[in-house]
Amino acid sequence: MSKEKGKTQNKKRKLTRQEKKQIDALIRQAKGDGKPHTAQDSIPFERMYKDGICRLANGRYSKCIEFEDINYQLAQPDDKTAIFEALCDMYNSFDASISVQLSLISRHANKEDFKSSITIAPQNDDFDSIRAEYTEMLQTQLERGNNGLIKTKFLTFTIEAKDIKSARARLARIETDTLNHFKVIGAAARVLDGKQRLEVLHGLFHPDGERFNFAWEWLPVSGLSVKDFIAPSSFRFGDGRMFQMGGKFGAVSFLQIAAPELSDRMLADFMEAENGIVVNLHIQSIDHNEAIKTIKRKITDLDRMKIEEQKKAIRSGYDMDIIPSDLATYGGEAKNLLRDLQSRNERMFLLTLLVLNLADTKQKLDNEVFGAAAIAQKYNCILTRLDYRQEQGLMSSIPLGENLIHIQRGLTTSSTAVFVPFTVQELFQSGEALYYGLNALSNNMILCDRKKLKNPNGLILGTPGSGKSFSAKREITNAFLITADDIIICDPEAEYYPLVGRLKGQVIKVSQNSTQYINPMDINLNYSEGDTPIALKSDFI
C-alpha cells in the first residue's frame, strides 16, 4: 500500500489550461514587447564595465577616447597637411570589423563652476573694491565669448565579440593604436573609464550642467542600475520632427553631402553655435577588395548603359557620341574613384553625419536648427530633419558607438578626413590662473597659471602703442589680487609709480639725487665658504 502511495506522489502533475495561460502571460511580460517604456529603456546599452567597456546589443562592445583640441585653424599650410595625413592614416587603420563614432559636443557647463573660476573672493582689506571691479571686468569678457560652453571631443570604436574577455583583448589593441595616432597628430588623448563615460552621458541628458553623482558601490545597496543615474526625468518622442528631454526641446538632423568639394571649416562652424550643439560622425570602413569589386561592377553597368545609348543613337540616326551628360559624368567619377582606391592608398567608408540641437522652447529650437541648416547650405550641403526617427537619432548622437540611423554616404579616406575635428586650442585653467585676454579665433577668455608650466618665464612683445605696458600692469594687478607672490618692478621711466602707489607698495628711487642707493662695493666677508669673497667681488666689478 505504501509503495503505491509513493508512486502516486512521484508522478508529475499536469498543468491545467489556466495555469499554462498564466505562465505564458508571465513569460510575455518578462520579455516585454521590445518597446521602451521608461527613459532608462530608451538608452541603448546593456552594461557599463568599470574599465570603460560598454556592452551594446547583439554582442557588440565599445570603448571611448577623449581627445583635446589643437591649433589647426591657426597652423601653417604644411602643418595642416601633416595633420590631415595623420587623420587619413588613423582612419585607414580601422578595418571593416570596427565601427567608429566621432563626437563633438558643445554644451553648457555648471554656472557655479564658471563663476567660481573667475570670481576673486574679498579678503576684507583695502583692495576689495579693486577685486570687485576686476571680477566685473572678467564677467563682462566671459559673456563676450562662449566660455559658458564646454567643448569636448570623443572617438568611440565598436567591435563584435563573443564575450567580454575576447572583446577586452581586442579593444586594448585598438586603443593602443589609436592613442599612438593621436600622439602623431599632437592631440592629448585619454581613455575614459566606466564612471567617466557615464558622466559624459549624464551631461548630454542633462544639458543645463547638473552635477553628476555616482559611485559603483551604490549599485548593490540601492538596487538601481547605472542608467538610473544618467537618465533624464523623461523622454517624449510623440512629435515626428522633434522630441522633449526633461525640460528641453531637441531635434536631430542628418547632413546630405551634395557638395562636389568639401571644406575643413564645416565642423568648426558647427561648433561655434552660441547655445550648444552635438555633431556626430559614424564612420564604417568597407573591405578594400569588396569596395574595388563593387566599383568595377558599377563601371561595367555604366558602360553597358553607354553602349545601349549609342545603339539607340545609331538607330535614330544621330551621332553616337551624344550620350546623356549624367552618364558621362558618373562614368568618369567612377573611374577616378577606382584609380584612387588602387593607386593612392585610399579606402572606402560609409559616413553618417548627425546634428543634435537643444533649446528651452520650440521657437528657440527652430532658430537653432535654422542656423545649423544655414551653415550646411554655406558648404552646398543639406541638413534634413529625421522625421519620425528622433529617438533613434538621439541615441545615435551619444558616444556609445551605436548607429541606429543608416542614412550613409560613401566617401574615400581623404573625403572623410576633410571633416577635421580640430579648430583652436583653448586655455582656461583654474586655481591661481591669470587673465591674458581673448582668444583671437574663438573669442574665448584665456586664463593661465604660468607657474604650472615647465618654463614660466615670459616676454611681452609688440609694436609701439600696442598695449605692452597696459598688459603688464593688468597682469601685475591680477597677480596682486589673487596670489601671495612678491612683485618686483624695475621701472626706469617711472610709469608704474601710480599703480604701485594705489596697491600700497614700496617705491625705491635710485638716482644721483635720491637718498636710496645701491653700493656695488658692499661686501660680506662671510657669504662665501670656499672662495675668497674679496677676489670674487673684485672680479665682479
For each feature predicted by the language model, list its residue ranges.
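Extended, folded cores of ATP/NTP-driven motor/assembly subunits in large transport
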Residues: S2-V424
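Hydrophobic alpha-helical scaffolding
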Residues: I164, R168, P324-L327, L358, ...
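Loop-rich catalytic cores of soluble enzymes, especially ATP-dependent carboxylate-amine ligases
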Residues: R389-N439, K454-N455, T463-S466, S471, ...
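Glycine-rich phosphate-binding loop of nucleotide-binding enzymes
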Residues: I70, P77, F84-N92, L179, ...
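Switch/coupling segment of Walker-type NTPase motor domains
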Residues: N71, S103-F114, D128, A132-Y134, ...
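Short capping/connector residues at structural and topological boundaries
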Residues: D79, N403, L441, T515, ...
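Conserved structured core elements
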Residues: T81, L149, A172, A328, ...
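A broadly conserved detector of short glycine/acidic/proline-rich loop/turn motifs that flank catalytic sites
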Residues: I159-A161, S285, K451-K452, E493, ...
